[in-house]
Amino acid sequence: MTAAHFMTDPQAMRDMARKFDMHAQNVRDESHKMFMSSMDIAGAGWSGTAQLTSHDTMGQINQAFRHIVTLLQDVRDQLGTAADRYEHQEENSRKILSGS
């Protein structure tokens, strides 16, 4: 599919929006697993500053993944809005051209 076709095909936009939503869900799920598994690594030799540093680093990484999820969801929403807007404009153009 060419970019020009994509930008004039509301269904293709919605299909792509669903893909972005799936990617957002995958990133969210996998980052949650990663964060939770990092909380379980503390042991007898893993405490104090090392543990605090690890938890701080993992918190920052988790925050970065949340930002990625937000970006993916924003793209999803914008594609859906663009598809609706294009369909509405297309319908208005048809009415104008048909004289209704």
From Swiss-Prot:
Against NCBIfam families, the record matches this protein to:
WXG100_ESAT6
Q: Describe the family membership recorded for this protein in Swiss-Prot or TrEMBL.
A: Belongs to the WXG100 family.
Instruction: Mention any Pfam family matching this sequence.
Output: WXG100
Protein name (database record): Putative ESAT-6-like protein Y
Please give the superkingdom of this protein's source: Bacteria
